[in-house]
Amino acid sequence: YVTQTTLSVDDTKNIVDALKIKFPEIKEPVKEDICYATTNRQAAVKNIAKNCEMFFVIGSRNSSNSQRLVEVAKQSGCNRSELIHSESDLPIEKIINCKTIGISSGASAPEVLVKNFINKIKEKINLEIEEVEIIKENIIFKTPGKLN
């Protein structure tokens, strides 16, 4: 079997478990075929969202990965989870009275978008930031020149 690289890790596990029951001799991939960034972000969102009043995923509206992160946040207990494209989409009126807001980004969203989003929130409300590292990622990609 093969899986889509941006599927929900939990959904994929459920499907694979069902396949193994129905087809005990099924051949598995040699290695994990869900990308590391997807797996890591889903684990982080799952850990953080359960403690948030509101959760934002920064990413493209047509990004399967970003959409899955919103689903994971909701499944983890934060029903007020939204996908936003950039800081200009920030619904200030929704966060004014929130005590805890979670933020993550899709695997392909540049870090500068996350920083811009946080800066936009800082302009509107007093903010204490706590970075939560669930899994250390050692891979670094160069930011495209247009985004610097």
Predicted feature descriptions by range:
Residues 21-54, 59-61, 67-76, 80-87, ...:
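Active-site rim loops that border cofactor/substrate pockets in soluble metabolic enzymes
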Residues 50, 54-57, 62-63, 71-72, ...:
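C-terminal functional extensions of proteins
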Residues 88-96:
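Helix-loop module immediately N-terminal to the HCX5R catalytic loop
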